[in-house]
């Protein structure tokens, strides 16, 4: 009887995973269709320079997505790749600066840190403005395994959401820089 129950659990788990994968592929397909529609629209308007710019942006985004996916940080990569598909009060852009390296030892820590920061940004930003966060992951720093740069542009409704992390830090990461104004925020975090 245990074997039957275990097989049922595995089938349910496989089905749930398959459904989630199909759901994620649907989001990805939707993103690509939007980009293709923009290219098609610009072609019909004979804005060829803009078409070439868009294609170049798509290539750059795909390269960063590939580098992120190859850092061996599946939880972090999942959060970044799916961020803009979820309800947030800002858009996310990311880039990997430097060579691909194995950061698997940092995956859980990075995912937890970024989820915390995303939550704080969602609490702090104005819901009436266009908000944009760029996260750069520098893998080739001479003194650190990784440096995260967060560069926010938009508007804050409640910047005090960051007070605790600014004053007390966060677990065992080194917050090297934290500057905030009513419309910008720069954060630099080092991991050894």
Swiss-Prot record:
Keywords: Cytoplasm, Kinase, Phosphoprotein, Sensory transduction, Sporulation, Transferase. GO terms for biological process: sporulation resulting in formation of a cellular spore. It is found in: Cytoplasm. Changing residue 30 to A: Loss of sporulation. It comes from the Bacteria. Phosphorylated by spo0F. InterPro entries: Sig_transdc_His_kin_SpoOB, Spo0B_C_sf, SPOB_a, SpoOB_C. One of its GO terms (molecular function) is phosphorelay sensor kinase activity. Coiled coil: none annotated. The modification Phosphohistidine is found at residue 30. Its main location: cytoplasm. It is an enzyme of class 2 (transferase). It holds the Pfam family SPOB_ab. One of its GO terms (cellular component) is cytoplasm. Its EC number is 2.7.-.-. Homodimer. Dimerization is essential for activity as both monomers contribute to the formation of the active site. Key element in the phosphorelay regulating sporulation initiation. Acts on spo0A. Mediates reversible phosphoryl transfer from spo0F to spo0A. This is Sporulation initiation phosphotransferase B. It comes from Bacillus subtilis (strain 168).
């Amino acid at each position: 009887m245990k074997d039957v129950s275990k097989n049922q659990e595995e089938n349910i788990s496989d089905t749930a995973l398959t459904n989630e994968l199909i759901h994620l592929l649907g989001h990805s397909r939707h993103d690509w269709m939007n980009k293709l529609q923009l290219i098609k629209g610009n072609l019909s308007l004979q804005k060829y320079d803009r078409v070439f710019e868009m294609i170049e942006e798509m290539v750059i985004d795909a390269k960063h997505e590939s580098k992120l996916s190859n850092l061996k940080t599946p939880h972090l990569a999942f959060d970044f790749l799916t961020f803009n598909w979820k309800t947030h009060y800002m858009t996310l852009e990311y880039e990997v600066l430097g060579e691909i390296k194995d950061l698997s030892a940092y995956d859980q820590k990075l995912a937890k840190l970024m989820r915390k920061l995303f939550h704080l940004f969602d609490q702090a930003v104005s819901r009436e403005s266009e908000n944009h966060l760029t996260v750069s992951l520098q893998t080739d720093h001479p003194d650190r395994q990784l440096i995260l740069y967060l560069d926010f542009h938009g508007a804050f409704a409640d910047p005090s959401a960051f007070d605790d992390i600014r004053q007390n830090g966060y677990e065992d990461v080194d917050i090297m820089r934290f500057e905030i104004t009513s419309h910008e925020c720069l954060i630099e975090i080092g991991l050894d």
